[in-house]
Amino acid sequence: NYMNEIREMETLDTDIVIVGSGAAGLTLALRTADFARVTVLSKGDLQDGATYYAQGGIAAVLDDSDSADSHVADTLHAGVGLCHRDVVEHVVERSASAVSWLVAQGVPFTTKSTAVATGDDAAPSSPAELSSLHLTQEGGHSHRRIIHATDATGKAVFQTLQQRAREHANI
């Protein structure tokens, strides 16, 4: 019966439970695991989530010719009234630091030199080298602000964050 099943369940000693193992869940796990024991729950295979299959890139203001105001305006225009300005501003203002954190984790984003067809997938060696990232321009954007990992950005982000989480003693 159900009560016997509950008594036989494994008990985990943890401080934080994160439901979801995509980019958001793994990022939260990695950002909290230095001061807490973290358990990440997934409803199925880890790579069944949307992050793994996302092919596009990540939009961030990383070029001197671009600005947060321009990115916000582009996003609000493309969102045709569905976006909340305060949320868009919040995300855009933090986009460069989020990309910097992903670079520090080792996500192999395409760089200007690798985009020239060297075949090398080396990522910038430090967040200070964000200027070496290859930027593309996609629909709805007035500037080149899309960073990518070839044509499989989501897979690269997911695999890197998953590896970091597996390596962390508190996750």
Segments predicted by a language model, with ranges:
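Extreme N-terminal leader/targeting segments of oxidoreductases
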Residues: 1-16, 34-36
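General small-molecule cofactor/ligand-binding pocket signal
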Residues: 12, 39, 110
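Conserved N-terminal/central alpha/beta ligand/cofactor-binding core
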Residues: 5-6, 43-171
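N-terminal Rossmann-like FAD-binding beta1-loop-alpha1 element of flavoenzymes
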Residues: 15-40
